[in-house]
């Protein structure tokens, strides 16, 4: 008989390698065939609900790493909540309207002008659905569980109808109005943009300091005086209607050199500006308060017939410029507001495509607005009023889709009033819990400082604004007309608005004082796509009876504070008076390994499919767990390779646990806590503490904490300690001995707990593990999270063992020194003499454990500290260690060096302990002998 046949060497078919790219797909197919997600939902019927409402990604293109981080994070939460006793359905969604889809069709060669609006919209719809299918496949490949066959799409008729009803409720409350205001205007898209559709880039623009001659000084200034203004948009000078100053500033009237003209500047800026203009011998003629200059009139530098009025505003600064601001009400919000106050025209001499209109005169007409800068500067110079031209670096808004600069431009638009409900919205924010908590202030400040929301778009692929016009041009949007449109859209889809005449979209027999002849027209603009996604609380959460409104959680990137978090909050407070969410969790962006934004032009993109094909989705999932998603996250193949190593450690740990519990039946062989060995009690308490820490981290969305605690537990508590000690017990002790069964009870409990706790993170792997466990549920996903158990005197036990672990570290240090001195090779070759204080001796007695076994040495003798020799390695005044090579021979069964080899004459090669085990459990060894 061979010695190895008397050992309980662990065996398992659980493979060492995951082969994830292949096996993950097999598992996902199995889950789909067996409807595991649906089974989980049914299992949790009647339990408290937890609804994470999915922010819809835009249906265009393949998913990127930011998508993966977002969807996987959501999956962690939904899966963990499902296993923690909540009914946690997950309904994925897509944002399916908007300009990028129109642009994709244009790129594909579709001639929009050759099609009717309805035909073009149908092509947009088909394209969007194709993109949804592509992204759905990508998201499912990440292992994300949810209602993939029943997602919400903003193009679905039932969703569009609810969106129209949200609009209707806001109209009913007087929150929808039409106005001509400066809005972000994208000439490249030929449409207004919302704040959330704008991104800022640093640019260099031509700026000009120039004088505007006073023609009516109101008794304060004479006519040989010039107001000095500064602009960074010389192309807007043709639209100038006035000059804005601050009532409280001191303004100096100055002369310089031999120039007879006088110039007005903010007194605080005279020295800086004089140096900039190259003026010498500057004299201050007089100083006046800004308030004294109100209504002073100046000559427009280009148009002699136009006069510019001096106005008092509160947005003027002396940080730069002259303290006098060129004011064009058609091209800026501050300009517009003060222009309204002073009754100025809102003059907008730039068309939808960014070209100067005919009424600007022959020098400007037909020029692209940026080209008009040069003409303005030239005309100022010709007029002799250009004081300084210089480049100016500043942050400027761009269309986030076309990546082209935009302009502020006053156009007739439909607005949703934020101002009327601002206080209510701000109050609602205070009821929301934020992760991280700085998110509350960020959203609060954005709502506090934002203007009204321009909700109209001059495009065709979107939800129509359900507004009619009477014969007198008055807008008609009654509760009756809007609900009628909503029902038509619900039945036929929003294309019906573009297929039917206005009269066929109104309720039968509808009349209005605005149309005595019964003739009506309809609005041609569509709603901002942020109104689409921002209505999802009604289109999805309130509409599906198994969801809740408000939702428990919205989880998106930090850009959504000005996007979806923002628009959803406005529409929800307007609709029902409260926020659409109880909690907001925001995440950073995914950057490349050097901290740069990923882009095709830089060639620094890493896409999820690339990682999945090489390593598997589990590696991306574990990577998401490992990073601080609340901040920007760097992505590199190197980081995935590091995570693959952590995955390998996890897998190997589990493999050991499975291999050493194959002959363990928890129903028959489990040992009660009170009857366990001391070391097993300690590990049982530790794994329960670990369980609580992980469950708490799930509850607080602290993913990175889960990763840290997982890695620490499997490397420190298991691999470096318990599993190391376990080999000397589970391999060597009698198969059914209480000592071995005690340790197997713990090993099995640990692997079950690890499997359940990691199922939200690594479902493909844990389901593979589950097939080797003896649990009742068919799938790990259908199990519950492990219970946190508490035991009598557990803290006392942990403190005792923690003190021993400190002593163990000291012994290991002494063993390492002995190894360096070539006294020993492996630790089991050592004989350790331990010299301990009375306190340590009391601890060792209280441990009631095999200390030699816990130290993994062949021999151990314990002595009073007072007997420690000079050469002992001392640790404080608590203990000292001497290491020598153990005497005796190596037992071929336990691999320890023993002095009692051959004490059993029938088993002459074994130590006494092994001989006793073999004699009692393997009688054939006595007759056959051992080799």
UniProtKB/Swiss-Prot annotation:
Annotated motif 'KMSKS' region, positions: 597-601
Biological process annotations from GO: isoleucyl-tRNA aminoacylation
Record: residues binding L-isoleucyl-5'-AMP: 556
Motif, 'HIGH' region: chain positions: 57-67
Any one GO molecular function term: ATP binding
Record: residues binding Zn(2+): 891, 894, 911, 914
Keywords for the protein's UniProt record, in alphabetical order: Aminoacyl-tRNA synthetase, ATP-binding, Cytoplasm, Ligase, Metal-binding, Nucleotide-binding, Protein biosynthesis, Zinc
EC number: 6.1.1.5
Protein known as: Isoleucine--tRNA ligase
Organism this protein belongs to: Ligilactobacillus salivarius (strain UCC118) (Lactobacillus salivarius)
């Amino acid at each position: 008989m061979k010695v190895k046949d008397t050992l309980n060497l662990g065996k398992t078919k659980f493979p060492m390698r995951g082969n994830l790219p292949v096996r993950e797909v097999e598992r996902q197919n199995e889950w789909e065939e067996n409807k595991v997600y649906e089974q989980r939902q049914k299992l949790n019927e009647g339990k408290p609900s937890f609804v994470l409402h999915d922010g819809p990604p835009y249906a265009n293109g393949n998913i990127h790493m930011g998508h993966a981080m977002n969807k996987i994070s959501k999956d962690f939460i939904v899966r963990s909540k499902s296993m923690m006793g909540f009914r946690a359905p997950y309904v994925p969604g897509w944002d399916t309207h908007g300009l990028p889809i129109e642009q994709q069709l244009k790129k594909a060669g579709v001639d929009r002008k050759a099609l009717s609006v309805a035909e073009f919209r149908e092509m947009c719809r088909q394209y969007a659905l194709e993109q949804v299918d592509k992204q759905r496949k990508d998201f499912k490949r990440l292992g994300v569980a949810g209602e993939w066959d029943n997602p919400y799409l903003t193009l679905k008729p039932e969703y569009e109808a609810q969106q129209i009803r949200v609009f209707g409720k806001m109209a009913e409350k007087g929150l929808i109005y039409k106005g001509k205001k400066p809005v972000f205007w994208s000439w490249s898209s030929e449409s207004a943009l919302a704040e959330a559709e704008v991104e800022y880039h640093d640019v260099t623009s031509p700026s000009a300091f120039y004088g505007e001659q006073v023609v009516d000084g109101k008794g304060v200034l004479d006519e040989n005086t010039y107001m000095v203004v500064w602009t960074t948009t010389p192309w807007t000078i043709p639209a100038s209607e006035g000059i804005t100053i601050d009532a409280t500033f001191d303004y100096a009237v100055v002369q310089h050199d031999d120039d007879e003209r006088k110039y007005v500047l903010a007194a605080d800026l005279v020295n800086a500006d004089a140096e900039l203009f190259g003026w010498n011998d500057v004299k201050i003629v007089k100083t006046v308060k800004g308030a004294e200059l109100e209504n002073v009139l100046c000559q427009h530098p280009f148009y002699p017939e136009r006069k510019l009025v001096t106005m008092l505003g509160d947005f003027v600064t002396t940080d730069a410029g002259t303290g006098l601001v060129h004011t064009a009400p058609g091209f800026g919000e501050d300009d517009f507001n003060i222009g309204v106050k002073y009754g100025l025209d809102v003059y907008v001499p730039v068309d939808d495509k960014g070209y100067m209109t005919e009424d600007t005169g022959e020098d400007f007409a037909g020029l692209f607005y940026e080209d008009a800068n040069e003409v303005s500067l030239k005309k100022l110079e010709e007029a002799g009023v250009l004081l300084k031209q210089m480049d100016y670096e500043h942050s400027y808004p761009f269309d986030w889709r076309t990546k082209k600069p935009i302009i502020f431009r006053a156009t007739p638009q439909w607005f949703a009033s934020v101002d009327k409900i601002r206080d209510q919205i701000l109050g609602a924010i205070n009821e929301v819990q934020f992760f991280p908590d700085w998110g509350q202030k960020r959203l609060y400040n954005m709502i506090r400082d934002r203007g009204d929301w321009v909700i109209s778009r001059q495009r065709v692929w979107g939800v129509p604004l359900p507004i009619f016009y009477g014969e007198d041009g008055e807008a008609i949007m009654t509760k009756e007309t809007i609900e009628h449109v909503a029902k038509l859209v619900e039945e036929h889809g929003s294309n019906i608005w573009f297929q039917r005449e206005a009269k066929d979209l109104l309720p039968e027999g509808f009349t209005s004082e605005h149309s005595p002849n019964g003739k009506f027209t309809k609005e041609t603009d569509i709603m901002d796509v942020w109104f689409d996604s921002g209505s999802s609380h009604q289109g999805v959460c309130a509409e599906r009876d198994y969801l809740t409104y408000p939702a428990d959680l919205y989880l998106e990137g930090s850009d959504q504070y000005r996007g979806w978090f923002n628009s959803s909050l406005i529409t929800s407070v307007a609709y029902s008076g409260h926020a659409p969410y109880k909690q907001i969790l925001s995440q950073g962006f995914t950057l490349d390994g050097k901290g740069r934004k990923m882009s095709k032009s830089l060639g620094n993109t890493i896409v999820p499919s690339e990682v999945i094909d090489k390593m598997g989705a589990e590696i991306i999932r574990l990577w998401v767990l490992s990073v601080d998603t609340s901040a920007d996250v760097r992505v590199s193949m190197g980081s995935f390779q590091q995570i693959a190593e952590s995955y390998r450690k996890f897998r190997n740990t589990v493999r050991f646990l499975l291999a050493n519990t194959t002959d363990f039946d928890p129903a028959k062989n489990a040992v009660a806590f009170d009857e366990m060995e001391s070391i097993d009690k300690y590990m049982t308490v530790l794994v329960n503490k670990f369980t609580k820490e992980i469950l708490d981290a799930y509850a607080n969305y602290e993913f990175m904490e889960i990763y840290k605690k997982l890695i620490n537990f499997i490397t420190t508590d298991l691999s470096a300690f318990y599993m190391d000690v376990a080999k000397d017990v589970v391999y060597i002790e009698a198969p059914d001995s209480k000592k071995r069964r005690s340790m197997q009870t713990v090993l099995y409990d640990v692997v079950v707990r690890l499997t359940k706790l990691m199922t939200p993170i690594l479902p493909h792997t844990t389901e593979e593990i589950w097939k080797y466990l003896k649990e009742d549920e068919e799938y790990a996903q259908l199990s519950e999270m492990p219970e946190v158990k508490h035991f009598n005197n557990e803290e006392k036990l942990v403190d005792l063992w923690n003190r021993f672990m400190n002593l163990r570290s000291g012994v290991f240090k002494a063993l390492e020194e002995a190894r360096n001195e070539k006294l020993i090779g492996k630790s089991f070759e050592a004989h350790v003499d331990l010299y301990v204080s009375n306190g340590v001796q009391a601890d060792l007695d209280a441990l009631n454990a095999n200390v030699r076994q816990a130290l993994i040495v062949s021999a151990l003798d314990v002595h009073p500290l007072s007997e420690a020799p000079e050469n002992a390695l001392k640790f404080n005044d608590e203990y000292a260690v001497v290491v020598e090579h153990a005497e005796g021979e190596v037992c071929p069964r336990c691999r320890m060096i023993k002095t009692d080899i051959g004490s059993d004459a029938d088993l002459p090669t074994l130590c006494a302990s092994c001989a006793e085990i073999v004699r009692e459990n393997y009688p054939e060894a006595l007759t056959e002998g051992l080799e």
